[in-house]
């Protein structure tokens, strides 16, 4: 009996010790995570840095922040969310003027999961909803006075839960719920059938090109088809209106099949924007949004689809490199989005380059046919009125290298409206270009504006664009930008396709009569009055006009990314040919499934290559921790120019350890007591900040209508206002720095982070990101534009080798960032997870050259959130210009040990340079506002850190005690058992 009791105690202590160890591990893990997220925890608790912004709001007379001004602000913020949708919703289709709805058309039925459970935004880092205020399509319809069929709503509420909505599943309800009394209810609510179609993807997950059912995720799934068929077969609905709740350009070639009357693209409207879209439906607002991506009939018809996703390296007998198992190659070159569809269209019309071959066709019944391949062009959008455009004149100022287009817009309808003026150009495609593999898009966006035009009135607007946008990058001949000789055609139109038709009419005249078509296949004539011609003054290709940077004339612009081209690394039998309009049929991309890792490529994939330079300075050559006669505090540097010598004195006060404090981000930057610099919080993201307000009801920060909507407004003022309102959010949340906006290019409609980027076009993103960043700066917020660059997919994002040629890099992918970073509006940039070629972006010297030299960028550089990994070498990153390590406080410690152990003055100089940028940037934020001089920083740890450390000690002690007790009881059990056996042996 005693033995059983003893064993029972041992087992109990075994269970208790196991539980204690588990709890201790959980507590330790929680502590680690909390310390990694220190800035966000401090922000949530109102500790250290909670007062790091010092006013500047426009919602109080003197700029001070208060509960009262917050109430004014939050009302305006939600109104602006609705304005985003009012100006950014795109009317794609409107058969027989089905929209706007009359006041008598108010008895409606909603269909589709998105009507009651829309995709408000992606789930990437960003704002959370405030449920009491969010608006679904049903909410917005009811608020607007519509009588929504309750029987159908009840049917959805009681139906079996649909399949989870994901990147590979639409997650639509089973249409079997529409039976009996449910379908009987249609007659009473038959004015309009509203169908909301939604698609979802997010950070870390691209939309599945083909799902488990073998369908493209951007075509209608079977349940959606059944819904439309049910509506059509019922015969009860006067109109069918689609709300397209998808930032991903869906396939829309089925509208006639299901008798759809109208389609309104609403994108991801954020939590509060949907009422703005419904005002477009009712006609309270005249639609003025235009597409930011091409809607193809088959979403895999773009040449980028041939090389999207993961493609595996073949290492053979070599040991694979860390995070180096996959690659993607942009074999389409510059022919991204509309630049492909429109260029192939022109060449088909003119019989050039075998453009009408079947190669690359996905929706055409015979040879390549524009009207069968494209549903809605880039830049396209309908209105409830009609506009006529005249390009009155075109002026060129050679001193500023600026073209000014004067455009008159006439509203020939009976409704007031906002007209979007889109200015495009066609540049010559010459023999020189063909010989040197310089590609030319048939039409390219140059600039835009938006103006109010009353019914029956005309307005004139000027659009200024840099002449530099007409240059093409020649990576093979001139190894720089070139300006071809010949005629340049400028045109305006409702999207790229109409503008191109206008150019072709002006350029070719009778030769294209009867050949020009719109996206529906209707023959059009083109509007030559919307075209102006400029003849370049050079009679042969000019390779010198743009030889030096327009932002830093001392720097020559020449090839920087030769090693980003897959052909730089590939064996001869694996080299690729980039898509060329000179031969569509023989250069159309095929999938590069694998790439042999030869010795050159293997060495290139190794990121652990840093070696201290032989001529590196010694740490002793630097003055650190200097006690000045008069201490210079953080606030004393307010207003001090970046190149002022005072910075040397200020930074000399800091020790190496103090310099490294700024360089480890923990969702914020810690305080530095030595110079009385407060800590601050840094937050994500492009769709809204993942923080809470410090005033009023302390609700979550605003979840805006997302960046594709901002881009689709085609309105500089609205885009700037988005940045300002985002900045106001930051003021009321005491946040000086945010990781936003996103500016990567939508190379594929399947890109997982589409909701965080503006457009498929680098120029539209150039202007939009510039405007948003400018608006943020107006409010004391440092926007951090991301992810720089070639980060167009989520698959394999950490370490994937991204290959592209330099023309595409410069004209498409870098240009999207150029407006915000080179024009001086943004002082923050985040590099990407991927490799540029084989070199990790944050360790790529080419990126530093572009930013610091060519673009004369004066802000800070941060890597994307990547903890210690062999492909992200801390010293390599630092030497390549990375100033702060995102969500990584271990890297600065690594740097400190390396500097002190190797006496590496080069690394130390980079640490000092990084602090120069970081302190300067923080002072340009709301941290440098009035009141900063009153800040006194304590070096005491926040209370929650002390508490967590105490809990760590307590639970670890309990775990140790439990283990000790288990060991003791186990030993006692064994000893007792031995004694029992001995006694038994003696009895025998």
Question: What role is predicted for each listed range?
Answer:
Residues 1-472, 482-492, 496, 545-988:
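Glycoside hydrolase catalytic-domain context in secreted enzymes
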Residues 467-542:
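Terminal connector regions
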């Amino acid at each position: 009996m005693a033995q059983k009791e003893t064993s029972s105690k041992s087992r109990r202590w075994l269970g208790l010790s196991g539980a204690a160890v588990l709890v201790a591990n959980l507590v330790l893990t929680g502590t680690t995570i909390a310390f990694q997220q220190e800035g966000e925890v401090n922000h949530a608790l109102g500790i250290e840095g909670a007062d790091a912004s010092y006013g500047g709001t426009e919602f109080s007379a003197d700029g001070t922040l208060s509960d009262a001004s917050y109430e004014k602000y939050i009302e305006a913020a939600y109104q602006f969310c609705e304005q985003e949708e009012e100006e950014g919703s795109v009317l794609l289709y409107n058969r027989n003027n089905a929209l706007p709805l009359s006041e008598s058309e108010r008895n409606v039925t909603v269909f589709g999961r998105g009507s009651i459970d829309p995709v408000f935004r992606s789930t990437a880092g960003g704002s959370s909803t405030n449920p009491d205020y969010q608006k679904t399509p049903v909410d917005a319809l009811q608020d607007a006075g519509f009588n929504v069929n309750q029987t159908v709503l009840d049917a959805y509420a009681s139906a079996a839960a649909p399949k989870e909505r994901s990147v590979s599943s639409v997650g639509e309800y089973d249409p079997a719920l529409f039976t009996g009394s449910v379908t009987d209810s249609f007659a009473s609510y038959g004015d309009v059938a509203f169908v909301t179609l939604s698609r979802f993807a997010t950070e870390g997950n691209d939309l599945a090109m083909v799902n488990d059912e073998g369908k493209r995720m951007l075509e209608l799934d079977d349940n959606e088809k059944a819904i439309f068929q049910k509506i059509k077969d019922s015969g009860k609905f006067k109109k069918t209106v689609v709300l397209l709740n998808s930032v991903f350009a869906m396939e829309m070639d089925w509208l006639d099949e299901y008798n759809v009357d109208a389609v309104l693209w609403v994108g991801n409207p954020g939590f509060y924007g949907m009422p703005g879209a419904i005002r477009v439906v009712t006609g309270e607002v005249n639609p003025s949004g235009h597409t930011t991506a091409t809607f193809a009939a088959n979403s895999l018809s773009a040449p980028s689809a041939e090389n999207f996703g993961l493609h595996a390296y073949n290492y053979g007998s070599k040991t694979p490199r860390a995070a180096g198992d996959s690659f993607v190659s942009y074999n389409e070159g510059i022919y991204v989005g509309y630049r492909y569809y429109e260029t192939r269209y022109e060449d088909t019309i003119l019989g050039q380059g075998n453009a009408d071959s079947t190669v690359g066709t996905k929706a055409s019944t015979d040879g390549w046919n524009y009207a069968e391949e494209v549903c809605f062009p880039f830049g396209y959008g309908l209105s409830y009125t009609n506009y006529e455009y005249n390009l009155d004149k075109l002026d060129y100022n050679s001193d500023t290298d600026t073209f000014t287009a004067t455009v008159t817009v006439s509203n020939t309808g009976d409704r007031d409206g906002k007209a979007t003026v889109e200015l495009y150009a066609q540049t010559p495609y010459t023999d020189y270009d063909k010989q040197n593999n310089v590609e030319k898009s048939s039409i390219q966006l140059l600039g835009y504006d938006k103006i109010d035009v009353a019914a029956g009135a005309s307005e004139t607007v000027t659009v200024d664009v840099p002449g530099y946008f007409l240059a093409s990058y020649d990576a093979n001949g001139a190894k720089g930008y070139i300006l071809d000789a010949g005629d340049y055609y400028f045109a305006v139109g409702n999207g790229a396709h109409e503008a191109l038709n206008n150019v072709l009419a002006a350029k070719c005249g009778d030769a294209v009569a009867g050949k020009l078509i719109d996206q529906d296949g209707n023959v059009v004539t083109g509007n030559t009055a919307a075209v102006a011609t400029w003849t370049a003054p050079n009679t042969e290709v000019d390779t010198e006009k743009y030889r030096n940077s327009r932002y830093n004339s001392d720097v020559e612009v020449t090839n920087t990314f030769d090693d980003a081209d897959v052909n730089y690394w590939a064996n001869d039998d694996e080299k690729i040919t980039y898509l060329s309009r000179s031969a569509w049929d023989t250069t159309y991309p095929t999938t590069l499934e694998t790439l042999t890792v030869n010795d050159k490529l293997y060495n290139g994939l190794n990121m652990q290559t840093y070696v201290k330079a032989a001529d590196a300075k010694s740490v002793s050559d630097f003055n650190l921790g200097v006690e000045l006669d008069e201490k210079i505090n953080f606030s004393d540097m307010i207003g001090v120019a970046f190149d002022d010598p005072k910075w040397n004195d200020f930074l000399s006060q800091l020790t190496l350890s103090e310099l490294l404090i700024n360089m480890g981000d923990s969702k914020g930057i810690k305080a530095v007591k030595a110079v009385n610099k407060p800590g601050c919080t840094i937050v994500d993201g492009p769709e809204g900040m993942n923080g809470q307000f410090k005033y009023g009801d302390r609700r979550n920060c605003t979840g805006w209508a997302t960046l594709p909507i901002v881009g689709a407004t085609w309105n500089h003022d609205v885009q700037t206002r988005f940045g300002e309102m985002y900045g106001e959010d930051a003021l009321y949340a005491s946040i000086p720095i945010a990781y936003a906006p996103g500016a990567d290019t939508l190379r594929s409609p399947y890109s997982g982070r589409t909701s965080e980027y503006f457009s498929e076009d680098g120029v539209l993103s150039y202007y939009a990101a510039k405007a948003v960043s400018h608006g943020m700066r107006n409010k004391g917020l440092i926007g951090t534009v991301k992810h720089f660059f070639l980060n167009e997919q989520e698959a394999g994002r950490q370490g994937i080798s991204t290959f592209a040629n330099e023309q595409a890099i410069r004209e498409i992918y870098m240009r999207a960032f150029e407006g915000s970073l080179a024009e001086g509006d943004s002082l923050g940039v985040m590099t990407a997870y991927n490799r540029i070629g084989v070199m990790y972006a944050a360790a790529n010297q080419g990126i530093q050259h572009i930013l610091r030299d060519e673009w004369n960028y004066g802000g800070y550089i941060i890597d994307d959130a990547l903890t210690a990994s062999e492909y992200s070498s801390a010293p390599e990153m630092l030497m390549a210009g990375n100033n702060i390590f995102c969500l990584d406080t271990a890297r600065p410690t690594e740097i400190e040990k390396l500097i002190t152990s190797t006496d590496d003055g080069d690394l130390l100089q980079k640490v000092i340079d990084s602090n120069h940028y970081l302190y300067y940037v923080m002072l340009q934020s709301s941290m440098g506002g009035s009141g900063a001089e009153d800040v006194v920083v304590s070096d005491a740890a926040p209370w929650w850190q002390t508490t967590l450390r105490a809990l760590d000690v307590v639970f670890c002690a309990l775990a140790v005690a439990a283990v000790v007790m288990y060991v003791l009881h186990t030993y006692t059990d064994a000893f007792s058992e031995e004694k029992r056996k001995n006694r038994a042996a003696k009895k025998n």
